[in-house]
Amino acid sequence: MTEKSHKKTAKGRAGSPSPTSARNKKADNGARGNKVSERLKAVKELQKTETKKARPEHVVNLIGDALWLMGLAATLYLAISLISFDMGDPSWSHSSPVVEDVANWGGLFGAYVADVGYYLFGWSFWWWIAAACVVLYKNFRLHAKQTENEAYNHKIAAAALFVLTVFSPVLEYFVLGGKYADSLPVGAGGMVGIRVGAVFAWLLGKSGSLLIILVVLLLSLSLLVQISWLEFLNGAGRAVQNRLSALSGKVMALGKRRPNTKTDGVDTQNTRRMVKEAKNITAKPVALPEGSSSNRKSVAVSVAPPPKIQVSLFEDDEPRQAGEYHKPTLNLLRIPDSEPVSINPAELERTAELIESKLAEFGIGVQVVSATSGPVITRYEIEPAQGVKGSQIVALSKDLARSMSLQSVRIVETIAGKNTMGIELPNDKRQDVMLSEILSSPVFAEAKSKLTVALGKDIAGTPVVGDLAKMPHLLVAGMTGSGKSVGVNGMIMSMLFKATPDEVRFIMIDPKMLELSIYDGIPHLLCPVVTDMREAGQALNWCVAEMEKRYRLLSHAGVRNLEGFNQKVEAAKAAGKPLLNPFSLNPDEPEPLEKLPLIVVVIDELADLMMTERKAVEQQIARLAQKARAAGIHMIVATQRPSVDVVTGLIKANIPTRMAFTVQSKIDSRTILDQMGADELLKYGDSLFLQPGSAEPTRLQGAFVSDDEVHQVVNYVKSQAPADYIEGLLSGEAALETANIVNPNADSDELFDQAVAYVLESKKTSISSLQRQLRIGYNRAANLMEALENAGVVSSTDLNGSRKILAHKDHL
């Protein structure tokens, strides 16, 4: 009995659920219902999406074209109906006799539409036509994909049209009230203008109402057209300013400019024109499209600014003095006639997404954070995902270039001051960098050094110049067609624009007889352009002897560099006590010291020079590179074959500044830069510039100067002063004379003259032959041979231990 009762009780408890379990069950049912409804919504959205995707693209375009044409037809119909409105036609606002012929060009329907519009809004009904034209134009531009900005906002335009059709009739009523009663159903302003105008006049008065209405109308018009009045006024102001500047420039040129008169430095009339062109090119902030398909942040874009031109504010009215040297002016160079290549933000965004997707295919996760666009390339800065090594991305440079269908991709593993990497891609449109852009920039005009050289523009489009005095020597390498020779020409031209022949002198060695021969005859040269490699050795010997001579002068004057020496000479001359030459050939009447010019040795092709005069050239270049900086002697050494047998360790170790254009292999890139990268450049001036003490090179686009421009500048410089060569510099006479000044004790041995005569007559340069001829010991013969080398009679020993005779018998 008890057992049965327990079973019933348990059954009863199981059959009647508790309140808590009922509530839980209810909640579960509600959650299930929500999930079902969410799934149904997702299915419906998916069906809509699939329906849209299933619709062919040409059908969508056809529907869009049809709607646009229908809107155009409706606008034209409304316009002709308003134009041909006649008060005698049947209308809604007043009764009229039944006529068979309706005067309105839109027919009976057009007459009714025009009557209703004019009755309600007066002439302000034409705002509907204006709004329709704006909408049609914006949609046409958007449909034709001629703009990269946001789509036209129709909701804002509708709100602006509503405000215009309310406030414009009020303005019309206040200004033209009572007029056009015979032409319009209720006169100017329509019923809206009459009713709303009465309210405004009662609340604010007529003057206050006009002020408020004008402000509202301007704002509404701005929203309808979707332009900024501030930008419009700013652009109008710039146009007026440019016009006034051009007019004032012409007036100043007519009033001040004299015939057949040129000014030093920058040509004013020419630079004003450059300023005018530069002002018309305004750099606006780049707005990237919203709603990117990727979930990453938008790419920050940096655009190369237009070049800033350094302008001389006042022209030089002082007449020239006869025989005075004047530097060339910028009107001898070609001004760039092309505007900076416009940046397409949408294209940058697409490229950034492409970089991320292509690297993701190789299992590398990155995020593009910014992009900097220059004249030739665009650098995309990327943040690698956690655990991704930079070397992994660098190793994919060729694969990335292939997958993106590009000529080359350069990956910068480290960017100074940032935790990002750089991927440099070539631009679709290449922009030339002209030499005149660099020479007219403030950074070049404000440089004080006479050895300032124009290098080009960096990755952001900023002009870059270098100071050869601080480098103090430059090694340039690049294959044929890379722009190496053009870059060297640009450097020489920069110094011609910056310095007079009294300040800078050149020695040019051109084995190819093509690149530097154009400068033959300019007053800056110390000797004719050297094309014979045997004479090149003599020229370098003279440079070494001149370096030693200058060091002795600096030591005697108690200064540390050539600049200090020239300042001391100038100060002594100004005080009336000029310094005398302590190493004069006439000790009884020494000549006064003069300021010494800087000397730049330009070697266009080192490889050919090393093949013919390897031992002597390598030693002389190494000696100059080690010691010549303080003496004011600097070198620009160029080669198209930067292999280890040309750019030897001895030369490379003493020239820390390097500039690499496109080279053929990674080995050549390592030779010139100690790292890869130069083999991935784009030719035609694309280069890497490695400064002393810098681990990472700077990518530059070299400045271009044409042969015609070089000819014009050279002809101008020749017309200013004749060539002033040092006699005997290439024959060894000048080197021998300089060596005697440097080492006056070289002939202290009583047998020195006999040794010179024997070497020049017998053509034998060995120590043993000199020992046998003069019947002296080996040590004395070796000292005499060393004295002959220091005096410039014989060269140093080559790889075989032999010497060459540098002097001639006539020197005796």
From Swiss-Prot:
Bias (Basic and acidic residues): 25-36
Signal peptide: none
Sorted UniProt keywords: ATP-binding, Cell cycle, Cell division, Cell inner membrane, Cell membrane, Chromosome partition, DNA-binding, Membrane, Nucleotide-binding, Transmembrane, Transmembrane helix
Main location: membrane
Keyword Transmembrane: yes
UniProt similarity note: Belongs to the FtsK/SpoIIIE/SftA family.
Domain comment as written in the entry: Consists of an N-terminal domain, which is sufficient for the localization to the septal ring and is required for cell division, followed by a linker domain, and a C-terminal domain, which forms the translocation motor involved in chromosome segregation. The C-terminal domain can be further subdivided into alpha, beta and gamma subdomains. The alpha and beta subdomains multimerise to produce a hexameric ring, contain the nucleotide binding motif and form the DNA pump.
The protein, known as: DNA translocase FtsK 1
Organism per entry: Neisseria meningitidis serogroup B (strain ATCC BAA-335 / MC58)
